[in-house]
């Protein structure tokens, strides 16, 4: 049985999980966020978004000062009390955004793959794609260790593109709406394990972990959690885990923040 009184970390995806996929509303999750905050349970945001976007959202959600995982694990924003850790305030894994952009531009020029990156357009275009304000859309372009893109070619070409990236030490990852290119060594799972170990080192005891996500790129995160909530999502691929023991994995009937609330209700209130 889970209790918010025990040493606990909650890791959560954003779009389609804690935030509504279309309106970005999070109010259905607000009561649980308040309850966790009052119990001093860290809610660690974990997303494909940039750290600039996530810091803005973190403050909006009342979670400022906590660590977060940005760009699918390629960037870790450290907790404000971790100032003695090398790299503070952020740890960046592997190849930089600029280097990845150079690789993609070369592949597009020489092998004629068809895609559009966030670097190819302005904030007004991204605002149209996402429904964000222009000021928020501008934050989506502040990548440090990944590139976000829209794929505009065939499935066959995608397989070729993925293979070429793998040869170059990169990975091609599907998110809720867009595709992401990042260092092959980076991942939400590695970033989460690093944060868990840091909390364990501080307290002397490994905290119990609960993760929530809705897309294929959340699977690595949910695999390393003690308990997992798979929020009903829009992605046709869904989320599939190696261990879907119903005592540790709950699939919600509701989407977005209502599903987020349902998952917390299942593992806490209903047990």
UniProtKB/Swiss-Prot annotation:
Mg(2+) binds at residues 13, 15, 214. It is found in: Cytoplasm. One of its GO terms (molecular function) is mannosyl-3-phosphoglycerate phosphatase activity. Its EC number is 3.1.3.70. One of its GO terms (cellular component) is cytosol. Its cofactor is Mg(2+). This is Mannosyl-3-phosphoglycerate phosphatase. It comes from Escherichia coli O1:K1 / APEC.
